[in-house]
Curated annotation (Swiss-Prot):
Record's function text: Sodium-dependent, high-affinity amino acid transporter that mediates the uptake of L-glutamate and also L-aspartate and D-aspartate. Can also transport L-cysteine. Functions as a symporter that transports one amino acid molecule together with two or three Na(+) ions and one proton, in parallel with the counter-transport of one K(+) ion. Mediates Cl(-) flux that is not coupled to amino acid transport; this avoids the accumulation of negative charges due to aspartate and Na(+) symport. Plays an important role in L-glutamate and L-aspartate reabsorption in renal tubuli.
Entry's family note: Belongs to the dicarboxylate/amino acid:cation symporter (DAACS) (TC 2.A.23) family. SLC1A1 subfamily.
PROSITE patterns: NA_DICARBOXYL_SYMP_1, NA_DICARBOXYL_SYMP_2
Protein name as annotated: Excitatory amino acid transporter 3
Glycosylated position list: N128, N178, N194
Pfam families referenced in this protein's UniProt entry, alphabetically: SDF (PF00375)
Regions of this protein lying in the Cytoplasmic compartment: 1-18, 83-93, 229-237, 308-312, 344-352, 462-523
Organism of derivation: Rattus norvegicus
All ranges on the Extracellular side of the membrane: 39-61, 115-204, 266-285, 380-392, 427-439
Binding site for Na(+) 1: Y98, T101, T102, G361, N365, D367, N450, D454
Modified sites of kind Phosphoserine: S516, S521
Catalytic activity entry: K(+)(in) + L-glutamate(out) + 3 Na(+)(out) + H(+)(out) = K(+)(out) + L-glutamate(in) + 3 Na(+)(in) + H(+)(in); K(+)(in) + L-aspartate(out) + 3 Na(+)(out) + H(+)(out) = K(+)(out) + L-aspartate(in) + 3 Na(+)(in) + H(+)(in); D-aspartate(out) + K(+)(in) + 3 Na(+)(out) + H(+)(out) = D-aspartate(in) + K(+)(out) + 3 Na(+)(in) + H(+)(in); K(+)(in) + L-cysteine(out) + 3 Na(+)(out) + H(+)(out) = K(+)(out) + L-cysteine(in) + 3 Na(+)(in) + H(+)(in)
Entry's localization field: Cell membrane; Apical cell membrane; Synapse, Synaptosome; Early endosome membrane
Any one GO CC term of the record: cytoplasm
Length: 523
């Protein structure tokens, strides 16, 4: 008698395990179809477009809701679960990986844009400008980055970031607006038309989570409670429970994800007004997308394979849900809950690694953004007929790397840092408006590359930290089996029937006493 076929069972198991991924892919395809049909057969007002995208807005709000508790709980528990020396080694390996891949991405982008030359055949006046240029000073932006690493108010850091703005000092004192000046300092003077302009620095707070400041605090807080022993264990247990509860909420949110993604992609297709710009900037877009494809399909998998010696594409397949989410919502921070779930449940990466590495990676590891900024800067130089020297190309490389590390994981942060890169080599900052029209699409693909780089980083750091993690496991098992190693020793005196001595830092009291101490006393 032959074996009963199990193909039906396997098919059902496959659907049960991958229904969310399949439904998300179907939602993307359906969203494109719906967007094209609605755009072609009806004229929607701006108000109608806003209402149409409402279900997608709800998805974004739900994902952003869990970012704060997830980052705080995961960072604290991840650091507290490890020895400070182990945490330092893991952190160093993660930073080296992030920096190395970012530098490789920048070099790759520059090689491609110099070879393809997408801006040589076009002129600046042939491309329509869109939007307005962000007002950014390189020095002020870098100082703001350092300031935000050390927030003065922890509660405020959960919903606001510090930002400075330059204001021209007018001869007559004319206080305007309701803005509160946090600090006022004479910044600089410039000569324009033989007139001296004086500026002052005004400190403001803008909406948005200060992720970098929270990560620094959680890192220190986790190290401290990890060294407190039993006194800090109650806090470790609390944040562990908070992390687990947050991940349960993420599972509920992901059930709604296909619906939200459908309306997100359809709403964006309906919203775009000028599709002609895609033809004009087609070669530039092809250069950026080619660089992102090479980095994500060749460079990152090759590094993973060399270090881990496993199939990188199987690992990437396990991250498919997170990559699709990043592609649709274009925010690595908002994708973080899904990235956690895929890395831990699909690829079985150690939670001590994911909780420590992923929040940091979502903040400072921006391979796709760095590549995009390098390509865009050289492209704008080509549009202006400017021949870049080796020194200027090196300047672009360094600035793009530094700016991408400082960019927050929020939509279109690349445009803000793009101004810094352009200013570093003397290119007109207003030319960033030439590429804004297509940035919404490129932003999605570079965010996907950013998330993929974070994911590969967890696998690589886990492999390199295997020995330290095993040592932590062994020491934990010893403590769990016999944490205090108490063995009563009879005192050699007349009261030996009722008294016991200190052994290994613990002590026992006479059985006739009401309370019996069985744990080590800490002095």
């Amino acid at each position: 008698m032959g074996k009963p076929t199990s193909s039906g069972c396997d098919w059902r198991r496959f659907l049960r395990n991958h229904w969310l991924l399949l439904s998300t892919v179907a939602a993307v395809v359906l969203g494109i179809v719906v967007g094209v049909l609605v755009r072609g057969h009806s004229e929607l007002s701006n108000l109608d477009k806003f209402y149409f995208a409402f279900p997608g807005e709800i998805l974004m709000r739900m994902l952003k809701l869990v970012i704060l508790p997830l980052i705080i709980s995961s960072m604290i528990t991840g650091v507290a679960a490890l020895d400070s020396n182990v945490s330092g080694k893991i952190g160093l390996r993660a930073v080296v990986y992030y920096f190395s891949t970012t530098v490789i991405a920048v070099i790759l982008g520059i090689v491609l844009v110099v070879s393809i030359k997408p801006g040589v055949t076009q002129k600046v006046n042939e491309i329509n400008r869109t939007g307005k240029t962000p007002e950014v000073s390189t020095v002020d932006a870098m100082l703001d980055l350092i300031r935000n690493m050390f927030p003065e108010n922890l509660v405020q850091a959960c919903f606001q970031q510090y930002k400075t703005k330059r204001e021209e000092v007018k001869p007559a004192s004319d206080p305007g607006g309701n803005q509160t000046e946090v600090s006022v300092t004479t910044a600089m003077t410039t000569m324009s038309e033989n007139k001296t302009k004086e500026y002052k620095i005004v400190g403001l707070y803008s909406d948005g989570i200060n992720v970098l400041g929270l990560i620094i605090f959680c890192l220190v807080f986790g190290l401290v409670i990890g060294k407190m022993g039993e006194k800090g264990q109650i806090l470790v247990d609390f944040f562990n429970a908070l992390s687990d509860a947050t991940m349960k909420i993420v599972q509920i949110i992901m059930c709604y994800m296909p619906i939200g993604i459908l309306f997100l992609i359809a709403g964006k297709i309906i919203e775009v007004e000028d599709w002609e710009i895609f033809r004009k900037l087609g070669l530039y877009m092809a250069t950026v997308l080619s660089g992102l494809a090479i980095h994500s399909l060749v460079v990152l998998p090759l590094i993973y394979f060399i270090v881990v010696r496993k199939n990188p594409f199987r690992f990437a397949l396990g991250m498919a849900q997170a990559l699709l989410t990043a592609l649709m919502i274009s925010s690595s921070s908002a994708t973080l809950p899904v990235t956690f779930r895929c890395a831990e449940e699909k690829n079985h990466v150690d939670k001590r690694i994911t909780r420590f590495v992923l929040p940091v990676g979502a903040t400072i590891n921006m391979d796709g953004t760095a590549l995009y900024e390098a390509v865009a800067a050289v492209f704008i130089a080509q549009l202006n007929g400017m021949d870049l020297s080796i020194g200027q190309i090196i300047t672009i490389s360094i600035t793009a790397t530094a700016a991408s590390i400082g960019a927050a994981g929020v939509p279109q942060a690349g445009l803000v840092t793009m101004v810094i890169v352009l200013s570093a080599v003397g290119l007109p900052a207003e030319d960033v408006t030439l590429i804004i029209a297509v940035d919404w699409l490129l932003d999605r693909f570079r965010t996907m590359v950013n998330v993929l780089g974070d994911a590969f980083g967890t696998g690589i750091v886990e492999k390199l930290s295997k020995k330290e993690l095993e040592q932590v496991d062994v020491s934990s098992e010893v403590n769990i089996v016999n944490p205090f190693a108490l063995e009563p020793t009879i005192l050699d005196n007349e009261d030996s029937d009722t008294k016991k001595s200190y052994v290994n830092g613990g002590f026992s009291v006479d059985k006739s006493d009401t309370i019996s101490f069985t744990q080590t006393s800490q002095f």
